[in-house]
Amino acid sequence: RIRYKGIVCDRCGVEVTRAKVRRERMGHIELKAPVSHIWYFKGIPSRMGLTLDMSPRALEEVIYFAAYVVIDPKDTPLEPKSLLTEREYREKLQEYGHGSFVAKMGAEAIQDLLKRVDLAAEIAELKEELKSASGQKRIKAVRRLDVLDAFNKSGNKPEWMVLNILPVIPPDLRPMVQLDGGRFAASDLNDLYRRVINRNNRLARLLELNAPGIIVQNEKRMLQEAVDALIDNGRRGRPITGPGSRPLKSLSHMLKGKQGRFRQNLLGKRVDFSGRSVIAVGPTLKMYQCGVPREMAIELFKPFVMREIVAKEYAGNVKAAKRMVERGDERIWDILEEVIKEHPVLLNRAPTLHRLGIQAFEPVLIDGNLLRLHPLVCEAGNADFDGQMAIHVPLSEEAQAEARLLMLAAEHILNPKDGKPVVTPSQDMVLGNYYLTMEDAGREGEGMIFKDKDEAVMAYRNGYAHLHSRVGIAVDSMPNKPWKDSQRHKIMVTTVGKILFNDIMPEDLPYLQEPNNANLTEGTPDKYFLEPGQDIQEVIDGLDINVPFKKKNLGNIIAETFKRFRTTETSAFLDRLKDLGYYHSTLAGLTVGIADIPVIDNKAEIIDAAHHRVEEINKAFRRGLMTDDDRYVAVTTTWREAKEALEKRLIETQDPKNPFVMMMDSGARGNISNFSQLAGMRGLMAAPNGRIMELPILSNFREGLSVLEMFFSTHSARKGMTDTALKTADSGYLTRRLVDVAQDVIIREDDCGTDRGLLIRAITDGKEVTETLEVRLQGRYTRKSVKHPETGEVLIGADQLITEDMARKIVDAGVEEVTIRSVFTCATRHGVCRHCYGINLATGDAVEVGEAVGTIAAQSIGEPGTQLTMRTFHTGGVASNTDITQGLPRIQEIFEARNPKGEAVITEVKGNVVEIEEDASTRTKKVYVQGKTGMGEYVVPFTARMKVEVGDEVNRGAALTEGSIQPKRLLEVRDTLSVETYLLAEVQK
C-alpha cells in the first residue's frame, strides 16, 4: 500500500513518509548522568521525600550537589541517608579509610537510595506504626503509606522517579514557523531542549577527558537544572528567560491552567457547524424563531443539503452536489428551506452565565448578514444589539430532540433562580403598553358607548374618540371573560386603549381595568359597571383616574398567565404583548428634547438653606463643639438631604405626560436618580479612595457643570469603569468554584424518608423583613402538618406540597413558623431527594429525578455576581473603624467561611439587654445581657453602631452591633442548623 516505504531523500537524508509522523514519532536523549524529575521531587507533598523518608530540604542539597548522602555505611558508625558536607566527607574518608563506606551526591545518589527501598517491608512497618502513632507522626505515616502503597499496587519502581533517558516530544508539537521576512519563530521547548543537549554533550566530553571532579560536578548540576527548566520552568529558582526577559514556556505550562492543553483544547474545542455574527432585533419573529442569513445557513446545513440534492437526483454523487452548492445553483435554496424545517439551532450569548445563555430556536431564512433575535429573549442572555452571538447546529437526532424539548426559547419563561418570568417586556414594549393604558379626563369622545371592540376601534381610528378617553362598552360583547353574574348584560366604563389591551389577554383572565393584583386574581371591580338607567357621565366623573400599567404589572400578568395556562399559551400571549407594545410605542411618538427637562422653582432656596446649615456646622466645629468625624457626617448628611428635597419637589411638580416622566414611571428606561441628575442636582461624589467628598456638585445636566464640577465627576466615573472590568473576572472565578463543589448534587430519588426538617420564619434584618414567610413557603413540602393557631384546624397535612395559595392561607391564618423539608436535612446519599428540594422554579412543577439542581444553584448565585458592585467598603457616611464588606467580596467571604471584616459582637446568653454603658477613658461601650443562667458582659468599640437597645430581648448568637457574624463563633454558641440559616439569610441579602 505505501508507495514510499523505505525511500530516503538523497539531498537531506530524511525518510519519505506521511507528514503525520511529525506529530507521532518521539525522540530521546541519553543523559550522561541521572537526573531527578522535578515533579516528583518538588511536587507537594514531595513523592521522593515521602518514599525515602527524607525532608525536601535534604533532597535538594543532595540533588544540586551541595552535600553528600550516605548510601551504605558498611561497618562505620555513619547513619544511612545522613548528609555530609564536602569537608565532613573528606574528614570521614581520612578517618575510616577509602572504600570503608559509600556516599554520593547528585540524582545518582538518590537513584541508588530509591533502588534500595523495600516496599513490602516499609509498608508492613508503617501499618504497625499506625496502630500506636498519633498527631503529626500519624499524619506523616498515612501520607507515606499512600505513596508506597501506590508504588506497590501499580508495579512502578521508585527509582524510575530519576531519569536516565529523556524523551523528546514530536517536532510538530514544538514547531518552527517561518515568519514573513525570512525570520523564524520557534517554540520555547526547542530552546529548552537545546540547552539540555548542549550541557549533556559537554558533560560527555568532560567525562571522556577525565576532567577534575569539581568541573564534572558543576556540569552535572547544570544538566539537572536544564532538565528541570524543560519540565517545569520556574518551579525551582529563577525561571530561564528568553528575549525581553520573558520566562520560557515549559512542558508543564503547556498543560496548566485555562490556556493549557486540557482546558483550552480538549474541553473547549472550537466546533464544526457553528458560526457567529452581529445580532439585530427581529420584532416580527415568533418566540421560538430566530433569523439566520441565507449565506450562513447554506454553510451550516451543507451536508444535509447535499444529501437532499443526491436524493432528488439533481446530482449524481456527493462530489457533484458539493460543487452545485459552491456554485450557488438556484435549486439549492428551495432544498435549504426544506432542510431547516423542524431543525432547531442553538444561539449562545457570551458570557454564558447561566443556562438561559444558550437557547434553541427554529431558523427562519433572511437576507443580509445579521442574526435576528427575538426581543423578549434578550433579557435572559442579557443581550443587547451591539455585539455578536454564536450559532450552533445540533446534528444527531438525539441532539435535535433535546434542543426542541428542553432548550426551545418559548419554554424558558421562568428564571430557574427565583421562578419569576425572565421574558418580561422591556423598553419600547413597556412604553407602548403604558401609553396605551393611560386614562385622561375630558378627552374627545368621553362618555361614548360602544356595542363592541370593533366599533370602539372604528371611532378611535376616525378621530371620534381618543385612546385615553373613558368610554362605555357592552359587557356582552366579551362573553368569554370570567364576569360575575351581577356584571353581565351591563355597560362597563373603560378606555379605548384598555379595550385593545384586554383584547390580547388570554380569554380566561379577568378584564384588566386597574393595575393591581386584586383585579388580576379576583376580577374587575364592580364600580366600573353602570346600573340600568344610570348616566355614564356621572359614573365617569365619580371615578378616580387610574395609573397606567407599568413594567412590574406586566410581569405580574405574565406570571399569572403562566400559572394558569403554562408555556404554549404564555409564549403566544407574550408575542401579542410585544407587538401591541411596539405598535403603540410607535404611534405615541414619544420624543425628548432639552425643554422636556423641568426646572425646579425653589432650587435656589433649598441650596441656600443647605449652605447656611453647613456654615453653622463648621462654626460649631471651630468652637470645638463637635469632632471632625461628626462634622464630616453632618455636612454630607446636609447635602444628601438637600438633594432629597429637590428630588421630592421634582416628583411633586412633575407632569405625568412629560416623556421623561413616562419613560421613568413605566419602567422603560431610567430611574429617579437619573431624572434628578438631569433636573435637580448631581449631589455628592466619591473621591478616588472611596470616601465621599464634602463639596457637592450643585449643578444638574440641564444647567451644565462647571469645569471643577466636571473634574469631580470623573473620579467616580473612572472608578465605575475599572470596577466593572475587575469584578467580572472575580465573579466568573466564584461561579467556577461554586459549580465545582455543587455539580454532583442531583435529584437522586423521590423521597429520602427523613424525619428531620427546618423550622422557617420570615427572614429579618434588624426590624426590617428581607423575605416574607409566604415567599419562603411556596413550592416546599411540609415536614409536619400545619394547624390554625386559633381554631386548631389542620390547614395542610405532613409531607404536602405548599402551593402559592396555600402559602397565603397559612400566613393569613397568623402562622409565624412552619417546619418544612429542606435540602439541609435531606438524608439522600450523593444528592438530594424530590421532597426535600420542592418545586423546580423554572417550570413551577415538582422537580424531576435527575435534575442537576447543584449546578442550577451555583449558576443562580454566580450570574447576578457580575451585577453585584465591588463597593467593598460602604459605610453610612461614617468613617468608622468597622468597615462592613458588601457586594461580591461579601459573597466570597461567606462561601469561604472567612473571618469577616467588620465583625459583629454576638451574645452567648439568651435574655434581655439591661444596660449599655459608655466608658470614655478606654473608648469602649459595655453591653450587659441578663439571662436565666447569669449575666453576660460584652465590650464593643466606641464607634460601633448598636443593633440593640436597653430592654430588647436577644437570643443566643444574636448580633449586638452592626456587621457580619463570624460563622465559626456562631457555631460555638448555637448549632449547625442556625449557622446554615444565617449563611442562607446573608447570601439572600
From Swiss-Prot:
InterPro entries: DNA-dir_RpoC_beta_prime, DNA-dir_RpoC_beta_prime_bact, RNA_pol_asu, RNA_pol_N, RNA_pol_Rpb1_1, RNA_pol_Rpb1_3, RNA_pol_Rpb1_3_sf, RNA_pol_Rpb1_4. It catalyses: RNA(n) + a ribonucleoside 5'-triphosphate = RNA(n+1) + diphosphate. Zn(2+) binds at C752, C826, C833, C836. Keywords: DNA-directed RNA polymerase, Metal-binding, Nucleotidyltransferase, Transcription, Transferase, Zinc. GO terms for cellular component: DNA-directed RNA polymerase complex. Binds 1 Zn(2+) ion per subunit. GO terms for molecular function: DNA binding; DNA-directed RNA polymerase activity; metal ion binding. One of its GO terms (biological process) is DNA-templated transcription. Transmembrane segments: none annotated. It comes from the Bacteria. Its cofactor is Zn(2+). Pfam families: RNA_pol_Rpb1_1, RNA_pol_Rpb1_2, RNA_pol_Rpb1_3, RNA_pol_Rpb1_4, RNA_pol_Rpb1_5. Its EC number is 2.7.7.6. The RNAP catalytic core consists of 2 alpha, 1 beta, 1 beta' and 1 omega subunit. When a sigma factor is associated with the core the holoenzyme is formed, which can initiate transcription. Belongs to the RNA polymerase beta' chain family. DNA-dependent RNA polymerase catalyzes the transcription of DNA into RNA using the four ribonucleoside triphosphates as substrates. This is DNA-directed RNA polymerase subunit beta'. It comes from Streptococcus pyogenes. The lineage of its organism: Bacteria, Bacillati, Bacillota, Bacilli, Lactobacillales.
